[in-house]
């Protein structure tokens, strides 16, 4: 298990992923047939040396790292001493023979949502309205999300334009939108900001948002319900572990009782990384995990080194806000 140094920001953020890997390994190897050993990676450039050390120690599989720089370094190596399941995506399309990566980035979610939006509004493409409007703020993460949405929509064959909205502009949004024909609207902002904007958009306009904009992520159930009323009908994506918590609760009850919803997402990534690893350890050129906790997982080595992850399409409703057995908080 390739981990970041203890006490580092990335180590704390990735802790639920490690919890998921450990929980899945215990579930699968109750007989003690497998041992998990952690190797710290401080400098991305040392990734090769760390993998060699693990292989020399008798390791047969490496799960991690999470750091994008470290994953990039490994993906550019000509040879790997053992199979690797990286938990991030490299920028390039080429990678060593024994390299596999599971993509947990916001960009991968945006790409899937853009395809859904284009398909759901196909009838509008025949009209004057072919462009989507992307509503965002000056927040750096929102900006990153908006740029990803624009690129994904263009790639999917639609037009897109970004608009920055500040609190003092909200009152003028309805007037500004009057007379404009859009195929749909994307929210590149959190649920609170999205819920404030939605009433100012035409009610018939289809709206879309990633899980970041989903009000079910609110800790306060009343606030979640209020925001869900405003965002009623918004199409978004979630991981199966959020849509169907019963399996996760039953299988990993003791492991995830104190996890927030965001931590649950990362925990689920760890479980799926372990599942992929148990198949990748045999150098399987094709892998299918239809019941993955983070989505339907599929991999074809002939098509590249990245695992395709299909999330669950869901529609926001005030009748479906938060899971009562999960403590919700943003981290």
Regions found by a protein language model. Give the residues of each.
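Segments of small-molecule ligand-sensing domains
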Residues: 255-325
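Hydrophobic alpha-helical segments within soluble ligand-binding/sensing domains
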Residues: 101-133, 144, 240-248, 269-276
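Beta-alpha junction/loop-to-helix N-cap segments that form part of ligand/metal-binding clefts
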Residues: 12-16, 31-92
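Structural motif
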Residues: 34-55, 110-112, 144, 166-179
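Extracellular/periplasmic bilobed ligand-binding domains
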Residues: 72-84, 130-133, 141-236
């Amino acid at each position: 298990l390739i981990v970041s140094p203890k006490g580092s920001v990335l180590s704390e953020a990735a802790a639920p992923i490690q919890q998921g890997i450990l929980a899945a390994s215990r579930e699968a190897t109750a007989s003690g047939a497998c041992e998990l050993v952690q190797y710290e990676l401080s400098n991305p450039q040392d990734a090769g040396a760390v993998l060699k050390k693990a292989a020399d120690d008798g390791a047969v599989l490496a799960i991690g790292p999470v750091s994008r720089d470290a994953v990039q370094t490994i993906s550019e190596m000509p040879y790997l001493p053992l199979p690797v399941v990286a938990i991030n995506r490299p920028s390039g399309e080429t990678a060593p023979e024994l390299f596999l990566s599971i993509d947990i980035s916001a960009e991968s979610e945006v790409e899937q949502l853009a395809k859904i939006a284009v398909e759901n509004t196909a009838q509008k493409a025949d009209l004057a309205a072919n462009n989507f409007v992307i509503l965002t703020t000056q927040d750096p993460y929102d900006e990153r999300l908006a740029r990803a949405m624009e690129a994904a929509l263009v790639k999917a064959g639609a037009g897109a334009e970004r608009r920055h909205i500040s609190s003092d502009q909200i009152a003028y949004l309805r007037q500004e939108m009057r007379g404009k024909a859009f195929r749909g609207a994307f929210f590149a902002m959190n649920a609170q900001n999205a819920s404030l904007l939605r009433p100012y958009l035409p009610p018939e306009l289809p709206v879309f948002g990633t899980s970041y904009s989903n009000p079910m992520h609110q800790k306060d159930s009343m606030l979640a319900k209020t925001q869900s009323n405003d965002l009623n009908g918004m199409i978004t994506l979630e991981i199966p572990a959020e849509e169907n918590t019963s399996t996760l609760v039953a299988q990993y009850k003791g492991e995830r009782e104190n996890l927030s919803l965001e931590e649950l997402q990362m925990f689920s990534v760890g479980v799926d990384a372990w599942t992929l690893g148990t198949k990748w350890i045999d150098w399987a050129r094709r892998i299918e995990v239809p019941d993955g906790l983070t989505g339907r997982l599929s991999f074809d080595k002939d098509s590249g080194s990245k695992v395709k992850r299909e999330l669950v399409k869901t529609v926001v409703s005030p009748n479906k806000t938060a899971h009562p057995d999960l403590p919700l908080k943003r981290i």
